[in-house]
Structure formats: structure tokens, C-alpha cells
Amino acid sequence: ALGSVKLSRDAEFQGIMPVRGKILNCLKADYERIFKSDIITDLIRVLGCGVEVQTKKTKDLSAFDLENLRWNKVIICTDADVDGYQIRTLILTMIYRLCPTLIQEGYVYIAESPLYEITCKDKTWFAYTDAEKTEIVKKLEGRKLSINRSKGLGENDPEMMWMTTMNPATRRLIKVMPEDMERTMQVFDLLLGDNLQGRKDHIAENGYKYLDQLDVS
């Protein structure tokens, strides 16, 4: 994924920091384990703002100072599949645990990458959800179409990545909103904390809503 993303960025103002695989669940881990993770400490150093924790186990990471943040947006970009969503959640959890002010002050965003590329003659549409794909196909009913599904960033060529994910004029960003921090804490704890029974109950009560998103391959 790094190759296509790096080739599609504008190096004048966009920096790319790869995260290889799933990072540590920072909600369940103690600080000693968190700051032994090179992936996490490297990410914090790239951000430049330090961490908001009171512990001597932060290695050489500085105390949090928003003025030292090197970027005006922190954008999480992952594959458009269940593994990508989990990685996205783990990165959000890391920021929430170590640098919550970034969320509170509105610096954190999620980049949406398209699920489908739909081509009709010499024109191309991008669909970010199955519902969008259905709507586009319906509008083009009767015409010869080519529909390609893309689940991984590495499968997208740089031109497509620039148009859909990197170009500020055409990309889609979801701003992570801090409107209710108490509710945010409850959700993070439910999904990633130690409350196993609560998580089971939540899945039992709400799992049916997401059956179409299950990856059973």
C-alpha cells in the first residue's frame, strides 16, 4: 500500500507514515508495553506533539505540546475492508489514549477509499459503499459497464489514489468529532477494553445490523 499512496501524494505538504499490520491495543496495554512498541513511538515522533501521560516509561518522548504538532491534519488511511477498519480503530485508540487533545481540537480525520471503480465508455465513477455502487449502476442501466472492486490500497494505482484519497479538492474525509468524550470513552472501552461480557452482549444485540459487512473468506 505504501507504494501507491506515496506515489500519489503531493510531497510539498503531505507526509506518509506506514503502519505495518495491526498495532497494539493501547486501551488494554499498560504504558510500559505501549512505549516498547516501535510502531507507536515512531508514530508519536512523526506527529511531533509528544504524549499526554504521566509516567516515566515514555522513553525519550516529550510531554504533550500542541504547538509542536507538525501537521494541520492527521489523516488515517486504511484498506476498505474489515481488517482495515480494525487497524483504523486501533490507531484511533492509540491517539485517544496518548494524545486525546488531537481529537478534542479536531485534528484527526479518516480518509475514505473507494470500494468500486465503475467505468462506462471513457467515463469513470467511484463508489465508496455498496449503496453508492447500486445507485450508480441503476443510473447507467442498459449500458455496458465495467465494475472493479478494490479492497486494498496497494491495488489502486497512484492516479486513482490521488483522485479519490489524496487530492484535497476531491477526496472524502471524515472528521473525528469529540462532541461527547464520555460516550467516546464508553464505546472504546466496550469495543477494545476488558469488558468481555459487555462486548458479547453488544454483538448479540446489534450484530445483525452488520451481517452484510462480514468477511467470511
Question: What does each model-found stretch correspond to?
Answer:
Residues 1-217:
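Conserved phosphate-chemistry cores used by DNA topoisomerases
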